[in-house]
Amino acid sequence: MFTYPHFNPVAFSIGPLFGFGPLEVRWYGIMYLVGFALGWLGARSHAKQPWSKIKPEHVDDIVFYVALGAIIGGRVGYMLIYGFSEVIADPLAIFKVWQGGMSFHGGFLGVLTAMWLYGRHIKQPFFVVMDFVAPWTAFGLFAGRIGNFINGELWGKTTSPDAPWAVIVDGQARHASQLYEAFLEGVVLFLVLWLYSRKPRPVMATSALFLIVYGVGRFLVEFVRVPDQQLGYLALGWVTMGQVLSLPMIIVGVILFVLAHRRAAEVPNAAVS
């Protein structure tokens, strides 16, 4: 058990310069930058594998478009699903990314769109690109959840103050659900995908495994995470929007994983990624 120290979300300020500023640099943005940088390093190393259809010269563009898709999709998805009333009251709120508020599922759709377009550009199948990208997205997910923790947002439900996992927030003992998600969606997801993709795998299999592992981790953490205030529980007094969006990911992931390995078994010299 420990007491949450209420971090200052602003890491440092620059300026004012030439009458503008000061420019506030927030931990939330820094964490995303660190996540993308680590993903870039890992992806460049992986691209050097002899079987990889994605070459090192593609990695810079891929990371740029992943970041663009994740940020735009994540922010738009969050505001449409969780903060629509806020957008109606203040349309400019959608651009205030530094204040927090990113939806994984929106960001996921943004990345899918960006990688589909980039795959067409380099003339590679969609799942070849996504299989390459999947393990390295875990760095961004981990960094984003640490950013949530620093911002003091997305806390878990109350728990016993005597519990070893309890974090005291404003006098209440709570689950640090952001750290649970950082572990499951970051550390566990990366290790599973990295170990699995260290040798050639059937096209689509790594992407499918991403859907399964992320979906299961998110679904489980939702049981101890406070539901979004705007939505509350959707059904049965415990079903959350996060679970509703994660369940299809798990189902689709299982189907794609089976299909990928079945095709590899049936087709000699089937494509690998």
Set out the residue ranges of the language-model regions:
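A feature for loop-to-transmembrane-helix boundaries and adjacent hydrophobic helices
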Residues: M1-S273
